[in-house]
Swiss-Prot record:
The lineage of its organism: Bacteria, Bacillati, Bacillota, Bacilli, Bacillales. Transmembrane segments: none annotated. Optimum pH is 5.5 (in the presence of sodium acetate). Active between pH 6.5 and 9. It is an enzyme of class 4 (lyase). Optimum temperature is 50 degrees Celsius. Stable at 4 degrees Celsius at pH 6.5 - 9. 60% loss of activity when incubated at 45 degrees Celsius and pH 7.0 for 10 minutes. Keywords: Calcium, Lyase, Metal-binding, Secreted, Signal. The 99 kDa precursor is converted to a mature form (77 kDa) through the removal of a C-terminal (22 kDa) fragment without any loss in activity. Ca(2+) binds at residues 515-517, 676. PANTHER family: HYALURONATE LYASE (PTHR38481:SF1). This is Xanthan lyase.
Length: 930
């Protein structure tokens, strides 16, 4: 307890010199404060007749009323709420301020039944006074129990309350509250999400007290570690779209979403003011949406594999979090440069409309509802196309495949990234959520919502290989071989060298992601722990009755709960989904398998996985079908292989099993490889630094490689060092002949025939995929001069010192990896019809040349980019669609050219597509033909 003398001193501080509110002259700070208040409440123009806004304000008023009724308002009180007694416990004090913030919102939001309620406001202010004396003042330690509450959580709530009730708070009272915040959070010096929270605390307080120096410091804080600049280690956003917090945890949908929200709000607040952000690195924020969030959002849900310990929070399930991220995208759309604002609106509209499970408007603020409805109701805004991609997040050991109708997330760990986070009594059963876990999303949008995490068997997470019934400790792994390769942003291969030291369990695990199938391989599975080892094929939440139909090899299986089965000679399985269509799953087992299955009702509580005070302890029950492969006790060199076939009917799965599109090339502890015959794809993971071959691919080092052969004319290849530890090169040989090529910097082609040979310099590449494209055909010229493409094939890159002429202002960018060379040019989606880039080759001989273009693709590109080819007979105009096909050469025809520099290719930014988009100029290739 505080001494009587100290209490008196604090009261004198609070009330000394008390005076009624002073009418200050309106200035820019007042405008910013009102802008922040509008962000919180929707402002005076909020339409209470709108049904979604009314539902939100009704809920707000109900929550506030419930809190108000439960308050202890007595003069002798020793707490504000009995349930949150314990005034020195930081989480309780933080929760008290959060409740008072809710009450302040109800008192100041148009349409709330408590709007303008003077008694409510007075009780809030009395509670703040009591808290100042008893809980939150400058005599407190800044870090007792949990520093986050004192320095970030409580100040954010108190700032908002001060803005909302600004006209009801005396100058003396306000100074006391603001001085306390300044005591706990005087400056900005942390990283990642914590830095963003510091910036918003300092910034909003600066607006309230009209401190220009502190407001500038808040703005400048965004330019620090873990926010605007891309991280190269530790916390923050990475150039590949990864987000890491606490040094080793993948957190795009957890701390990353907080960085996004807080940064978007502070940038919005300052936009158009004296303190608006001018740091050029703010452009990275726009890329967060494209690279970090668009691939990881599925129909309103944020993928759980990047939410860390937050998956154990009952109030923050995947759709609620996804809606919060979309709310931040809506906020960014209010002030981002026009092309990005337009793209953000399209993305937001698509996600809001396609989430048929949970209403977006039920999870966001009244102001966000107002802004989002303006987007959704605008017929001139077309929803963005659904993602169709494969993306490797090398910096956080994650990968994602998105296809129309389904998505698959893959969560791995390594010496760089930890398996799971469990601190502050949260995520107590997260053991295998990042240990080779697969997350399959389809039209069953409730799969990972509605109490999945407290009820799923946490020892059997899909995709994992485990010692049966045993947990693993949180931490980084013992092997650096985790990662994969992306080919053309559409296909990929990933792998993990698994080792659980506690159980002497090791395995090599790979996943090959093609168009509508995911192939999972395991090899070298060994253990001496005396515990059964198993690989979990799936653990799917079923419908409410638990009676989803399922078949094995076409024969119906029991749908009774509590039934466990051993199925032998299984070639394929089909499991009916929880929706009328779009949620069935097929499983194909090449060569057959013995499958263990269990259908059961599972009961659990959120409290069992999150032991925080406010976590509900009510039991919930859900039904599951679990399938796994039993490798036996103390296996040595065991293996497995299966194929996931999302959204296929039973008949389609049976037909696939009879004539599979995939072929397992090899599955050993040295190399794992799969061929997709219909697409011409071969993927291979090489596990050792010895020369090994898989199909057409030979590698001399640890590597992940994927190739695609297109119509016997072109061979695309991508290579990465998933270990991120090779400080030299990888030598690749492909059993094909070529007559020309293009390649990323870092690739040196040494031979085109009778086989293709090249090396990849992966020193410092940090898991990046390197791309090369080969024009197939016979070559008789012998070895290629390293570093120079074989003539007569000439490439002109935008970065070349000669042969490139710009008209108008073009910006240089390097964000996208499906580019040629170090960077590319874009027109900033401005000055349409006034800009061009002309590529002029110096051709060694006269004759016919086939002309190719390469560009980094993006959905915000122009779909009809005008291209003029200047040749010996005149000029020919053609058009290309830059929204897709990035990172590969596209032929635009064959033309006659004179020797020398008389020919050219001009890329124009005429606005002829619909809708208008960015135009990029990257590279042009001229290949002589016979």
């Amino acid at each position: 307890m505080l001494s009587g003398i100290l209490i008196a001193a604090l009261l004198m501080t609070l009330w000394g010199g008390w005076q009624p509110d002073i009418a200050h002259a309106s200035d820019e700070f007042d405008a910013l404060r009102i802008k922040w208040a509008t962000l919180l409440t929707g402002g005076p123009a909020l339409d209470p007749a709108d049904s979604d806004i009314a539902a939100r304000t009704d809920k707000l008023a109900q929550d506030a009323n419930d809190y108000w009724e439960d308050m202890d308002l007595s003069s002798s009180r020793t707490y504000i709420w009995y349930a949150l007694r314990g005034n020195g416990t930081s989480d309780n004090v933080n929760a008290v301020y959060e409740r008072l913030r809710t009450m302040a919102l109800a008192a100041t939001t148009v349409g709330s039944s408590l709007y303008g309620n003077a008694d409510l406001k007075e009780d809030i202010l009395d509670a703040l006074d009591w808290l100042y004396v008893n809980s939150y003042n400058s005599t407190r330690s800044r870090s007792a129990y949990n520093w986050w509450h004192w320095q970030l959580g409580i100040p954010m709530s108190l700032n908002d309350i001060a803005v909302l009730l600004y006209d009801d708070i005396s100058a003396a009272r306000m100074a006391t509250y603001m001085d306390t915040i300044d005591y706990f959070t005087p400056s900005i010096g942390l990283t990642g999400a914590n830095r963003a929270w510091q910036a918003i605390v300092v910034g909003v307080r600066a607006v309230i007290v009209k401190d220009a120096v502190k407001l500038a410091a808040a703005r400048n804080g965004l330019s620090g570690t873990g926010i605007f600049p891309y991280a190269t280690g530790g916390d923050g956003f990475y150039a590949d779209g990864s987000f890491v917090q606490h040094t080793t945890f993948a957190y795009t949908g957890g701390y990353g979403s907080s960085v996004l929200e807080t940064t978007a709000n502070l940038m919005y607040l300052l936009s158009g003011s004296t303190w608006s952000v001018s740091d050029p690195n703010q452009s990275n924020v726009w890329q967060w949406i494209y690279e970090a969030y668009r691939p990881l959002l599925y129909k309103g849900a944020m993928m759980d594999m990047v939410r860390g310990r937050e998956i154990s929070r009952s109030y923050a399930q995947d759709h609620a979090v996804g809606h919060g991220i979309v709310a931040s995208i809506v906020r960014l759309a209010q002030f981002a440069p026009a092309p990005h604002a337009a793209a953000f609106k399209q993305i937001a509209k698509r996600v809001i409309q396609e989430d048929t499970f949970s209403s977006f408007y039920g999870d966001v603020s009244t102001d966000t509802i107002r802004l989002a409805k303006a987007i959704v109701d605008d017929p001139s805004i077309a929803p963005a196309a659904a993602p169709n991609l494969y993306k490797q997040y090398a910096a956080m050991d994650r990968a994602v495949l998105q296809r129309p109708g389904f998505a698959l997330g893959l969560a791995l760990y390594s010496t760089r990234i930890s398996s799971y986070e469990s601190i502050n009594s949260e995520n107590g059963r997260g053991w295998y959520t990042g240990a080779g876990a697969t997350y399959l999303y389809n039209q069953d949008l409730a799969q990972y919502s509605e109490d999945y995490w407290p009820t799923v068997d946490a020892y059997r997470i899909p995709g994992t290989t485990v010692a049966s019934g045993t947990p693993i400790a949180s931490g980084t792994g013992t092997s650096s071989w985790t990662g994969g390769v992306s080919l053309a942003g559409q296909y990929g291969a990933s792998g993990m060298d698994l080792s659980y030291g506690a159980y002497n369990l090791s395995a090599r695990k790979s996943w090959f992601m093609f168009d509508d199938e995911i192939v999972a391989l395991g090899s070298g599975i060994s253990s001496t722990a005396g515990i059964p080892i198993e690989t979990v094929v799936d653990n799917r939440k079923l419908n409410g009755a638990g009676d989803n139909a399922w078949t094995a090899n076409g024969a119906a299986l029991s749908t009774g709960l509590g039934v466990a089965q051993t199925l032998t000679g299984v070639n394929w399985v089909h499991l009916a989904g929880n929706t009328a269509d779009g949620s069935d799953i097929g499983y194909y087992f090449p060569g057959g398998a013995t499958l263990q299955t269990k259908r059961e009702a599972r009961t659990g509580t959120w409290k069992q996985i999150n032991n925080r005070p406010a976590t509900p302890s009510t039991a919930v029950t859900r039904n599951y079908e679990t399938m796994w492969i039993d490798h036996g006790t103390n296996p040595s060199g065991a293996s497995y292989g299966y194929v996931l076939l999302p959204n296929k009917t039973s008949a389609q799965v049976g037909a696939y099993a009879a004539d599979p599109a995939i072929e397992i090339v090899v599955n050993t502890s040295g190399v794992q490889s799969v061929k997709e015959k219909t697409l011409g794809l071969v993927g291979a993971n090489f596990w050792t630094d010895t020369t090994q071959t898989a199909d057409l691919i030979t590698s001399n080092k640890k590597a992940s490689v994927m190739t695609r052969e297109i119509a016997d004319e072109r061979l695309e290849a991508s290579v990465s060092d998933p270990t991120q530890a090779n400080n030299g090169t990888i030598a690749i040989e492909l059993a094909r002949s070529a007559e020309g090529y293009s390649a990323d910097p870092g690739i040196t082609v040494t031979q085109l025939a009778p086989t293709i040979k090249f090396t990849v310099n992966v020193n410092g590449a940090k898991g990046k995929s390197f791309h090369a494209s080969f024009q197939l055909g016979e070559d008789t010229s012998g070895p290629v001069d390293p570093g120079e493409p074989e003539l007569p094939s000439v490439i002109v890159d935008n970065a070349d010192s000669a042969g490139v002429t710009r008209t108008g202002t073009w910006k240089t960018a390097s964000t996208q990896t499906d580019r040629y060379g170090a960077n590319y040019l874009h027109d900033d989606n401005a000055g349409k019809g006034t800009k061009s880039v002309t590529f002029t080759p110096n051709l060694p001989i006269a004759g016919s040349y086939e002309v190719y273009l390469m560009w980094p693709a993006h959905f915000n590109r122009e779909d009809a980019v005008q291209v003029d080819v200047g040749h010996a007979s005149g000029t020919t105009r053609t058009a290309v669609d830059q929204r897709s096909g990035g990172g590969v050469w596209h032929s635009i025809g064959t033309y006659e050219f004179l020797a020398g520099s008389g020919g050219s290719v001009t890329i124009r930014n005429d606005a002829l597509g619909s809708p208008d988009g960015y135009v990029v100029a990257d590279a042009v290739k001229f290949v002589a033909v016979g």
